[in-house]
């Protein structure tokens, strides 16, 4: 990292540098745009351009000072058409009070006042100048300053402040937005001092796949066994007014019915019983004719 020209109070901590390296914010692409050369540290033998994270930190602080200078936070619009940055801009907006546009940017948001989503922000922040090119183009028409997360191959046309970082990785994008939000809150005085850690973890800014989250926790239903319900309850046949099961098996569908069936099955089916034909025989001395009702006389 190159020597910093910032005051000592703004120097990054060792934890900040470790987080930037762990999130691979320093790894750019194999292509290099001419305007991004000042932020280049070196090129690896495999052709990957390495970004100077010292420059990344300086630009994060510069962008935070610009954001904190705007009186109304709602006049700041954060935009991300890239899926990896949509969760980050929503969290940034909730923590700083900015206006978020996560997903497709509707053409005319900044230039066509007839549209319902028309906005007049004083500053916009985009995740990727390439995917958010429409927003940058419209901002240039109405003289709106632009802050952008730029990779080594990102176009910098109409970008006023470029934060050099890896804008294609989910962790890199989330970390830069998290650092930017933390610095804004520090400059506004929301955080007491720079020695106090922010209680919001950086994981909240990372992209999460909805399908992966749904498949992560799959709970299989099962019927409680005798060990879960209790041997005493089965032996007693769940005698009581209610069929509630007290124990680990409570709340499992079909537990009481299964236990009662097991108790009934314990009884012997070989018990001696009476003849069903004998019980239905007519009493001796009584004729069937006598049992017929007398005919009514007309």
Swiss-Prot record:
The keyword Chloroplast does not apply. It comes from the Eukaryota. One of its GO terms (cellular component) is cytosolic small ribosomal subunit. It is found in: Cytoplasm. Keywords: Cytoplasm, Ribonucleoprotein, Ribosomal protein. Coiled coil: none annotated. Transmembrane segments: none annotated. CDD domains: RPS2 (cd01425). Its main location: cytoplasm. The keyword Hydrolase does not apply. GO terms for molecular function: structural constituent of ribosome. Pfam families: 40S_SA_C, Ribosomal_S2. Required for the assembly and/or stability of the 40S ribosomal subunit. Required for the processing of the 20S rRNA-precursor to mature 18S rRNA in a late step of the maturation of 40S ribosomal subunits. Belongs to the universal ribosomal protein uS2 family. This is Small ribosomal subunit protein uS2. It comes from Aspergillus niger (strain ATCC MYA-4892 / CBS 513.88 / FGSC A1513).
